[in-house]
UniProtKB/Swiss-Prot annotation:
A Pfam family it matches: Lipase_GDSL_2
Homology family: Belongs to the 'GDSL' lipolytic enzyme family.
Function: Favors the hydrolysis of several arylesters.
Organism of origin: Vibrio mimicus
Effect of residue 29 to A/C: Loss of activity
Keywords: Hydrolase, Signal
Protein name as annotated: Arylesterase
GO molecular function: arylesterase activity; lysophospholipase activity
Group of enzyme by EC: hydrolase
Gene Ontology biological-process entries: lipid metabolic process
Taxonomic lineage of the native organism: Bacteria, Pseudomonadati, Pseudomonadota, Gammaproteobacteria, Vibrionales
Active-site feature positions: 29 (nucleophile), 176, 179
Oligomeric form and interacting partners: Homodimer.
Length: 200
């Protein structure tokens, strides 16, 4: 009898663990915990934030500082095979923009990533990215337009860029003016959680 109860408990726990959805965050330094302990980064805080919204989600942070869309595209197949996520959040493009990469190249890389993710059976959420205005209005506008146009064309969800809110609080930004401090990470985690629960 005890053995039977143990087996029942084992299978119940196994089913519960399998019920947790898996989210892969594919990003750059904005998601990689730049110049801070990784446990303070918003992806590390995200599971608890999602749990507050009633969503049990395992978060895999596949972000690497300095990554471009090309780097993300190159790494994506292995990440999909290794983690088999249910949902992938793409937070890439800032480094492409800072280096002045052609919008056509960025669009192509993002589009290929979306196709790979869809082919794996996972859903996609893409984050809007914006480059600083000192890159010129023409390029900044062309860069910004990549994301809504691609989201509409590929029929994927587009998440607002969290940095547009964070940057309004100077005390939350590092001296480089590009990266959020550890103090901003809990707010970012809650912001992302509120957006993601719409798609989980």
């Amino acid at each position: 009898m005890i053995r039977l109860l143990s087996l029942v408990l084992f299978f119940c726990l196994s089913a519960a663990s399998q019920a947790s959805e898996k989210l892969l965050v594919l990003g750059d330094s904005l998601s990689a915990g730049y110049q801070m302990p990784i446990e303070k980064s918003w992806p590390s805080l995200l599971p608890d934030a999602l749990l507050e919204h009633g969503q049990d989600v395992t978060v895999i942070n596949g972000s690497i500082s300095g990554d471009t869309t090309g780097n993300g595209l190159a790494r994506l197949p292995q990440l999909l095979d290794q983690h088999t996520p249910d949902l992938v959040l793409i937070e890439l493009g800032a480094n492409d923009g800072l280096r002045g990469f052609p919008p056509k190249v960025i669009t192509s890389n993002l589009s290929k990533m979306i196709s790979l993710i869809k082919d794996s059976g996972a859903n996609v959420v893409m984050m809007q990215i914006r480059v600083p205005p000192n890159y010129g209005k023409r390029y900044s506008d062309m860069f910004y337009d990549i994301y809504p146009k691609l989201a509409e064309h590929q029929q994927v969800q587009l998440m607002p860029f969290f940095l547009e809110h964070v940057i309004t609080k100077p005390e939350w930004m590092m001296d480089d003016g590009l990266h959020p401090k550890p103090e901003a990470q809990p707010w970012i985690a809650e912001f992302v959680a509120q957006e993601l629960v719409k798609h989980l």
